[in-house]
Amino acid sequence: MPRVTISITAPGTPSDGELLTLELPPGSTVKDLKGFIEAETNLPAASQGIYLNGQPVSQETQTLENVGIRDGEMLAVIVRQNRQQPQQPAASRPAPVGQSDPEAVRQQVLRNPQVQAELRQRDPELLAIMNDADRWREAFASRQNSAQNAERERQNQIALLNEDPFNVEAQRKIEDIIRQERVVENLEKAYNENPEVFVRVHMLYINTEVNGVPVKAFVDSGAQATIMSPDCAERCGIMRLMDTRYAGMARGVGTARILGRVHHAEIKIGGAVMPCAFTVMEGKDVDLLFGLDMLKRYKAKIDLEKNALCFESIEVPFLHESEIPRNLDEAEMNEPTVAGPNGTEIGARSGAVRPAGGSAAVEPSTQAGPSAAGPSSASTPAPAPAQTAPAPSAPGPSTASSFPEEHINQLMSMFGVARQEAIQALEIASGNVDEAASVFLG
């Protein structure tokens, strides 16, 4: 007895999106299959289009075996709507009380602080006018009309595409529409049932001292090395100890230039003084990144329950949000966004929800380069020491270069790097193409 699973696409019906499993008698025809589907879902057999592996099954008198439907097959059924159905105005359908009576909804919002909190996240502009009945009524009606128009447009589009059920391109467009609906539904479900995922998570910082200078360190177990910015190294007075033989390029989300390495300096954490090595790197948004190398060396544990970085004998509390440096937050405010429910914006990297217009959306194409790389991009291991002369003091990058084009093109073709990266490698290697290649080999 063949057993098939059927995915039903029937917009505007209770069966839309359902998965139906049927056990069919041996020798059943395609017409019989449609009859079984109609009996289970009340969807007219004449409106059903059956698809196997994306291809329509149209020979109704053939048996399932003859048209290639075997036991365990997955079928798709797309129901063609009555052509007159899209002409039925949406207003003629009964609407829930909340949609037909804006004042009833307003009173519910006024009485229920929990509803106010939800509305503050979903539609802060509407919440701001809840005490003005006239403005509320106008805004509510505007939102209701927009939703009805969007639904009517969607139904009309599906109806037009369904006029030719055997057009592969039309069915692909219907599939895209349905897929996008599922994405929006999934976003709405997360927004309603798991709103915590849209709250910005603040990074973990601790207070430290390096060479007697206070520094707020970002704790990042995803970074392989402990990293310090050149400005911070200057403030702490350890730039003079930097070994430029360890210069190179770090790769992750974008690239960052490694100026060198300080092999030994003292860092004070929670009253304990610990020897530490620092990789000095440009292009980071933090002064000091306390990486996995030091976390493992001192057997540190990130204890989120205690909100502390725990060593064997001390616990160092993570900084409160108000004490965290603002440069990372400013970078997050300029991150790219995607559209969320009710006009909100959701950060593409952080997942944080903001009111519409709450940030300046940055095109993803502008995010390439070291400054766009998040702290975790520092997890790229520092290159091994160069074999010859130390690197010169960090010259400013430039597209125009005095290096031979042949050398630049050679590095670009060998390692698939951008022109600017090839020039930077040649600058580090004082123009020696072989030493520049060792920068990329790490």
UniProtKB/Swiss-Prot annotation:
It comes from the Eukaryota. It is found in: Cytoplasm. It is an enzyme of class 3 (hydrolase). GO terms for molecular function: aspartic-type endopeptidase activity. Pfam families: Asp_protease (PF09668), UBA (PF00627), ubiquitin (PF00240). Residues 4-84 form the Ubiquitin-like domain. PROSITE patterns: UBA, UBIQUITIN_2. Its EC number is 3.4.23.-. InterPro entries: DDI1_N, Peptidase_aspartic_DDI1-type, Peptidase_aspartic_dom_sf, UBA, UBA-like_sf, Ubiquitin-like_dom, Ubiquitin-like_domsf. SMART domains: UBA (SM00165), UBQ (SM00213). The active site is at 220. Residues 82-102, 333-403 are annotated as: Disordered. One of its GO terms (cellular component) is cytoplasm. GO terms for biological process: protein transport; proteolysis. Residues 82-96, 364-402 have a biased composition (Low complexity). Residues 402-442 form the UBA domain. CDD domains: RP_DDI, UBA_scDdi1_like, Ubl_Ddi1_like. SUPFAM superfamilies: Acid proteases (SSF50630), UBA-like (SSF46934), Ubiquitin-like (SSF54236). Keywords: Aspartyl protease, Cytoplasm, Hydrolase, Protease, Protein transport, Transport. Its main location: cytoplasm. Belongs to the DDI1 family. Binds ubiquitin and polyubiquitinated proteins. Probable aspartic protease. May be involved in the regulation of exocytosis. Acts as a linker between the 19S proteasome and polyubiquitinated proteins via UBA domain interactions with ubiquitin for their subsequent degradation. Required for S-phase checkpoint control. This is DNA damage-inducible protein 1. The lineage of its organism: Eukaryota, Fungi, Dikarya, Ascomycota, Pezizomycotina. The gene is DDI1.
